[in-house]
From Swiss-Prot:
Signal peptide: none annotated. Disulfide bonds join C16-C27, C22-C38. Expressed by the pancreas. It is found in: Secreted. It comes from Squalus acanthias (Spiny dogfish). Transmembrane segments: none annotated. This is Colipase.
Amino acid sequence: APERGLFLNLSAGELCVGSFQCKSSCCQRETGLSLARCA
């Protein structure tokens, strides 16, 4: 079961921790220090 408070099915540009959260299955960091976003 997914953890409570974990967002799934996110749209492009939304903050993500892992690619499993994104509709596109692509979670990318633009730089090493920035937060990752769905692509």
